[in-house]
């Protein structure tokens, strides 16, 4: 099982250079999403297709009444605006919250709460859409331009593919470090010197990062039989806590044994805490209650819980006005990389890692010139 619900975006520029999606045997989700609407105790599923990629279903889904024609037109205009120009321009200009941005685009509360909140709340791992609009614009563009895919062997195949180029003999894991210096690491009571040290993590604090609950189920069959993500459109006005559900094995059959299905539910940490669900048992029961209302209690009762994962530092905080760069702090400081140095995404992590490697090469070759690596702000 992946640690959390992970997908790759094929539109990520730097990731596409560093990762061969074909060699990982990636398979895509279908563009768009399904949404579940619970009314008077009865669940209804509706499809929100992408009219740019699936024009016929896009037109049909525009007539299902889930969103108004006015909202759909405004979403279309927003898509056209965000997908134009250079990617770097997405990180310039206004830096308010995602909610502020959507409201400036004159989207209705219904569209925001029913569609954008469960989708992007589940991506950003926060339930108020307080993430910087710059990151929203970037992720929205990536989703519009590319596909969400699952590698055959899970998300771990991404670092493993990079490790192959380095050579497993050159990688040592599982060593507890007691002290970090620019050219030395202290572990097992001794100082070990190196040509250079790169710190690829942030030191967590009580207020650092966002947390998420991911619950994986083993089901005898898929409850959706669809290669879409299912969004909870009632998240804002009910006691439910699940942001979205996916059946990864519908997309990538290798994720479950033959004749079984893997069902994965995502619960944003601050939503669970707000609703008073902070233990594994209470979160699992709340998730089963949600899914039982959508798919039927009889169906969900046959599912076996495979894992209840509480990931405490799943993403760095990228609130509006929080400007992070991808450069080492100054002078001879230890080089630091990771998504916390840029923005919380696979692209942010890989782009930061590449830039740190360029800086490391510069130092090792005694090059005094400034590295002109990519610098982005959030």
Stretch-by-stretch model annotation:
Residues 7-12, 90-96, 105, 141-164, ...:
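Short beta-strand to alpha-helix junction loop
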Residues 132, 155, 346-349:
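Conserved donor sugar-nucleotide recognition element shared by glycan-biosynthetic enzymes
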Residues 135-184, 192, 196:
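Helical element adjacent to the flavin cofactor pocket in flavoenzyme catalytic cores
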């Amino acid at each position: 099982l992946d640690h959390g619900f992970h997908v790759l975006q094929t539109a990520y520029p730097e990731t596409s250079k560093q990762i061969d999606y074909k060699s990982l045997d990636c398979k895509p989700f279908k563009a768009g999403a399904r949404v579940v609407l619970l009314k008077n105790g009865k669940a209804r599923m509706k499809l929100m297709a992408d009219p740019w990629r699936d024009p016929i279903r896009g037109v049909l889904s525009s007539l299902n009444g889930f969103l108004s024609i006015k909202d759909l037109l405004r979403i279309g205009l927003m898509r056209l605006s965000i997908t134009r120009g250079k990617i770097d321009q997405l990180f310039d200009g206004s830096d308010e919250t995602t909610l502020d941005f959507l409201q400036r685009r004159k989207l209705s509360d219904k569209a925001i709460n029913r569609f954008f909140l469960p989708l992007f709340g589940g991506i950003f791992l926060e339930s108020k859409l307080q993430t910087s609009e710059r990151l929203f614009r970037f992720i929205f563009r990536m989703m519009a331009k590319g596909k969400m895919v699952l590698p055959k062997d899970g998300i771990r195949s991404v670092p493993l593919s990079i490790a192959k180029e380095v050579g497993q003999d050159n990688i040592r894991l599982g060593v507890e470090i007691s002290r970090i210096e620019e050219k030395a690491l202290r572990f097992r009571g001794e100082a070990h010197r190196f040509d250079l040290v790169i710190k690829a993590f942030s030191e967590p604090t009580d207020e650092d990062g966002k947390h998420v609950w991911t619950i994986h189920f083993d089901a005898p069959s898929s409850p959706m039989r669809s290669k879409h993500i299912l969004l909870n459109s009632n998240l804002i006005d009910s006691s439910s806590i699940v942001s979205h559900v996916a059946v990864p094995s519908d997309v990538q059959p290798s994720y479950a044994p033959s004749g079984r299905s893997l069902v994965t539910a995502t619960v944003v940490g601050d939503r669970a805490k707000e609703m008073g669900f902070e233990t594994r048992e209470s979160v699992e029961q709340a998730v089963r209650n949600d899914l039982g209302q959508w798919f039927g209690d009889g169906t969900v009762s046959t599912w076996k819980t495979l894992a209840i994962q509480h990931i405490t530092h799943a993403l760095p905080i990228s609130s509006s006005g929080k400007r992070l760069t991808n450069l080492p702090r100054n002078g001879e400081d230890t080089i630091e990389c990771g998504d916390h140095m840029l923005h919380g995404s696979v692209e942010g992590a890989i782009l930061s890692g590449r830039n740190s490697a360029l800086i490391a090469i510069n130092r090792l070759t005694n090059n005094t010139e400034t590295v002109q690596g990519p610098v982005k702000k959030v």
